[in-house]
Amino acid sequence: ANRPVYIPPPRPPHPRL
């Protein structure tokens, strides 16, 4: 049985100032 792996939502790329 495989354990459900929590996948965090993709974060938007932060603008590099």
Curated annotation (Swiss-Prot):
Tell me which positions the record assigns to the signal sequence: none
Q: Give the UniProt subcellular location, in the record's own words.
A: Secreted
Output the GO biological process annotations, alphabetical, semicolon-separated.
defense response to Gram-negative bacterium; innate immune response
Sections of the chain in a coiled coil: none
User: Would I find Secreted among this entry's keywords?
Assistant: yes
Entry GO CC: extracellular space
What keyword terms does UniProt attach to this protein?
Antibiotic, Antimicrobial, Immunity, Innate immunity, Secreted
Looking up Pfam families in the UniProt record yields: Apidaecin
Instruction: Recount the UniProt induction comment for this entry.
Output: By bacterial infection.
Spell out the InterPro entries in the cross-references: Apidaecin
Record function comment: Antimicrobial peptide active against many Gram-negative enterobacterial and plant-associated bacterial species. Not active against other bacterial species like H.pylori, P.mirabilis, B.pertussis or N.gonorrhoeae.
The entry's family comment says:
Belongs to the apidaecin family.
Q: What is this protein called?
A: Apidaecin +A
